[in-house]
Each structure stands twice: as C-alpha cells, then as structure tokens.
C-alpha cells in the first residue's frame, strides 16, 4: 500500500477494508513518503520530483515481492494512471484507491459533488470522474465542495464537511469524498443530507481484491 501522507486512522481504515475483502491472510506492506504530498501542496501540482519518488515506491514494492499495489493518494492518482504500463510489464497491478468510487458516483447520478480539503486533490478527482464518465458513455455535472479543514481535529473536520455537504446538497445526486482520510465522516454526511455519500477505502479494497482474483490469487 503506497501512501504519500497518512494518519494512523487512515492506515487502520484501509487495512480494515482490505481484511473485509481478503481476510487476514494477506501480508500488508506500507510505503510512506509524506514529502510527496507536501511538495504537491507547495507547488499546486505534481512536480517531476514528486512523481519520480512515487514511481520509486511502486518499484520498491515490486522488488519487495508485492502481488498488487494500492495507491492511496488521490492527489497523485494520475501518476498511478501513467504507471499502468509498468504494472502490466511487471505483472504487478497498480490500483487507484479512488477509481471505482468515481465509477460508482457516475452510476448513481448525473450531478456529482466532490468534497475535498486540498485543491490538489479536488482537481485530480474531478478529472477522474470526468474520465470514467466518458468511458461509461455518460455525462456528469461536477460541483466543487472545497473545505478549509486540512489539519482540523476529527470533530471539527466532520462538522465542516457536513456543513459544506448541506450547502451543495440541492445541486447534487451523490457526493464523493476525494481523500481517503475523510472516510470516517461518510455516515455523518449521509445522515445530514440523505443522499449517497462515497468514500474511497472500501472501493479501493474491492478493486484490490478484484485485481488479485484476475491474477488467479
């Protein structure tokens, strides 16, 4: 599992979802480099250096004997897209944590709200929703939900997300949470607005399981 910035809560959430789908059998290796997201936030885009370090983590995972790689940071998800040929060549799939979540959002409605606390996550997530919508021969309207809550404690974070969701609720059919670290607010937001709310860890774990099944594992 490749993280560019993380918290113990996110690791616990992702591991829990993986075990729900795969049981306790898999050995989970965590690779972390917080400097990647810090550099992306500082520049406002994925720099060449940040992309190189991320791909370096993919290659380290391959060298360490990984059977599949889960990319957990949506801010650098497009690097994972660019690395798909590496996955095919090495036989080690590189799975984005958020892609199947984006597909489910397109299935659920034409108006998709995207909640994020970082502009560098908001735009790549919107790009992914637009791409998968084209692939599904669908069209979506995207509604921004940028919240200034990065670094807030859990209660404050949840309250700010709920307030933003309520603000855009009439404009959307479904809301997706652009960052995996937002997953713990999913139920609270759903209760507040009464519309589908999607977070990436469970979809990423399902995609991981599917990738392993396709390898015959």
Q: Where are the regions that the model predicts?
A:
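Non-catalytic structural scaffold of enzyme domains
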Residues: 1-217
